[in-house]
């Protein structure tokens, strides 16, 4: 396993990590969740990602029980939560980034995950109804209390992230260390263009999600739409409509052919492509089966196969390279 610094922090995070969105407490059994965590940990994965909204808190409960049962050395792994969407309840102050909800969400996550502190705590979305100063102060306070080690953002704009940093600098507080954006072969603009200056200035770490574009960059959908897949789950029609377009399927088929020429598989090529980006700190894997995780962990062996020539072949297939504005 390769380990990278998380932004400019001293924290070392495995290049591949394990996420729990749509799987833990929902799509898979607790037994499979445990098998996935063991397989990941035994292969050097040290970061396990979660959030208050995942399965309305049940995902964190499942992960917490597993962590308690396995009894891993707490210094050997990182665990995260995210605050904004709440755990499914919708009364005032049960969502958002107010000081009240941030504090209560952190305490609830610690209880569900059965840990004394969160290594990473993300603001899951920006909150237009809360002053950024209040959010930065709240996160800084949690760090001072020892409940959180590093805080960050998820799906924030570059402007919002920089505003948080400016507030933190002016008030002599701790700013966000990392951002969790979607990043894959079909979703590139934010990481490759919008954040480009932030990488150079404040040194943003990234924990990217959906590296396989919700499964489109696997062989699942190359010849049709099997019903027993993630995109076939009830309530995820919006995800299916956004992810499964004919254009993407055609590109996936071409990429699959290239992967075969390189002696690898499409998911491994897609993951290796993400890993090749030096601004990516860790790639979050989602898996519902242990053998899928085993295959995806092999992506590290494919990175060196993406030579400049292969990278250009990929660009020709994708035909979507983001262009920075001329200013």
What are these regions (language model features)?
Residues 110-131:
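Active-site groove signature of glycoside hydrolases
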Residues 28-40, 96-113, 161-166:
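Short, acidic/polar
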Residues 18, 50, 81, 120-123, ...:
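Conserved beta-strand positions
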Residues 25-28, 51-60, 127-131, 158-159, ...:
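Acidic-and-aromatic substrate-binding clefts and catalytic sites of carbohydrate-active enzymes
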Residues 70-97:
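Structural motif corresponding to the early beta-alpha repeats
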Residues 1-77, 116, 144:
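N-terminal binding-site loop/beta-alpha segment at the start of enzyme catalytic domains
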Residues 20-31, 89-103, 124, 129:
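Active-site mouth loops of central-metabolism enzymes
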Residues 132-318, 326:
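Beta/alpha (TIM)-barrel catalytic core signal, keyed to glycine-rich beta->alpha loops juxtaposed to Asp/Glu
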């Amino acid at each position: 396993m390769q380990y990278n610094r998380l932004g400019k922090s001293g924290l070392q995070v495995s290049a591949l990590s394990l996420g729990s969105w749509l799987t833990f407490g929902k799509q898979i059994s607790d037994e499979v969740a445990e098998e996935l965590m063991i397989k990941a940990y035994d292969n050097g994965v040290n970061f396990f990602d979660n959030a208050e909204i995942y399965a309305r808190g049940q995902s964190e409960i499942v992960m917490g029980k597993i962590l308690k049962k396995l009894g891993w050395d707490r210094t050997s792994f990182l665990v995260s939560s995210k605050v904004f969407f709440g755990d499914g309840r919708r009364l005032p102050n049960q969502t958002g980034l107010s000081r009240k909800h941030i504090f209560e969400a952190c305490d609830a996550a610690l209880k569900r995950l059965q840990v004394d502190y969160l290594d990473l705590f993300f603001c899951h979305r920006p909150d237009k109804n809360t002053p950024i100063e209040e959010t930065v102060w709240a996160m800084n306070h949690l760090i001072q209390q020892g409940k959180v080690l590093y805080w960050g953002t998820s799906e924030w704009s570059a402007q919002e992230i920089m505003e948080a940093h400016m507030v933190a600098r002016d008030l002599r507080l701790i700013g966000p260390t990392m951002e969790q954006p979607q990043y894959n072969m079909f979703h590139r603009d934010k990481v490759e263009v919008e954040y480009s200056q932030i990488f150079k200035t404040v040194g943003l770490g990234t924990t990217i999600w959906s590296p396989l574009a919700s499964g489109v960059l696997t062989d699942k959908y190359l010849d049709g739409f099997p019903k027993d897949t993630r995109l076939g789950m009830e309530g995820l029609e919006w995800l299916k409509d956004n992810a499964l377009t004919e254009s993407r399927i055609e590109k996936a088929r071409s990429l699959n052919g290239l992967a075969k020429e390189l002696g690898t598989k499409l998911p491994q090529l897609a993951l290796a492509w993400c890993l090749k980006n030096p601004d990516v700190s860790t790639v979050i894997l989602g898996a519902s089966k242990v053998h899928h995780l085993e295959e995806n962990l092999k992506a590290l062996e494919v990175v060196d196969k993406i030579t400049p020539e292969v990278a250009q072949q990929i660009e020709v297939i994708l035909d979507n390279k983001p262009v920075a504005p001329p200013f």
